[in-house]
Swiss-Prot record:
Function text: Protease. Hydrolyzes gelatin and succinyl casein.
Record-linked SUPFAM superfamilies: Trypsin-like serine proteases (SSF50494)
GO cellular component: extracellular region
Family affiliation: Belongs to the peptidase S1 family.
Key words of the record: Disulfide bond, Hydrolase, Protease, Secreted, Serine protease
Protein name in the entry: U21-ctenitoxin-Pn1a
């Protein structure tokens, strides 16, 4: 997260860290959001093909890697990794995946402050501002963060986002902005490498966090004037429901 601030324990109980085996060491790879006691939503590009389940694990209830043995922290193995069937490797569209934990996540009145995130109730496109969180790089090519960070970004209407990326002078003309994407930022604040798959969310009138997007592949981090790319969760609800039933 670029230009973010450090979060406090328990503020985002549905946030997870996905670790991937790199040369026999498990390392921070992506973020994700807990949907229910079995399923987590994240990005498709987080996973190398062919998928080897034992090369990934998920941490819940964690805020800082300096305290990864804290009593709130739980680690889960995975039983399924389901990539969206229309996702193409290194592509930008349909960059969404669902992962299932091998054992259920205790979210019902969990003393560990672990919970699922809600979906927004309305069908209208989100507008205004939204927040993204993660343990990713704090600047392009920079170090990753030991602490979970948060940043609030302006949402950019997709037509405008499409114009920015598709402009003849754009350095990222190859990125096709489609209606199933959300764009946010462009003001120097952004998600970055290793934040992928993490949640973009807003708060409803009751103050409940609602998931509107997941961090997707995009331009370089915090690239001046270019908004960050997210998958629009509402566009994938029927796919998600089908996978989870």
């Amino acid at each position: 997260i670029v230009y973010g601030t450090v979060t406090t324990p328990g503020k985002y109980p549905w946030m997870v860290s996905i670790h991937e085996r790199v040369k026999d060491v498990m390392k921070q790879a992506c973020g994700g959001a807990i949907l229910n006691e079995n399923w987590i939503v994240t990005a498709a590009h987080c996973f190398d093909q062919p998928i080897i389940l034992k090369d990934y694990e998920v941490y819940v209830g964690i805020v800082s890697w300096l305290h990864k043995n804290a009593p709130t922290v739980q680690k889960f193995q995975l039983s399924k990794i389901i990539i969206h069937d229309k996702y193409v490797k290194d592509g930008f569209a349909n960059d969404i995946a669902l992962i299932k934990t091998a054992t259920p996540i205790d979210i019902k009145g969990s003393k560990y402050g672990v919970n699922g995130i809600c979906f927004p109730s309305g069908a209208t496109d989100p507008s205004g501002e939204a927040t993204v969180i993660g343990w990713g790089m704090i600047r392009g090519g920079g170090p990753i963060s030991a602490e979970l960070r948060q940043v609030t970004l302006p949402l950019v209407p997709w037509q405008k986002c499409k114009q920015i990326y598709g402009h003849p002078d754009s350095e990222f003309e190859y990125i096709q902005v489609v209606p199933s994407m959300l764009c946010a930022g462009g003001n120097g604040k952004d998600a970055c490498q290793f934040d992928s798959g993490g949640p973009l969310f807003q708060y409803d009138k009751k103050g409940v966090a609602t998931l509107i997007g997941t961090v997707a592949n995009g331009a370089d981090c915090a690239y001046a004037h270019y908004p960050g790319m997210y998958m629009k969760v509402s566009a994938f609800r029927s796919w998600m429901d089908k996978v989870m039933t």
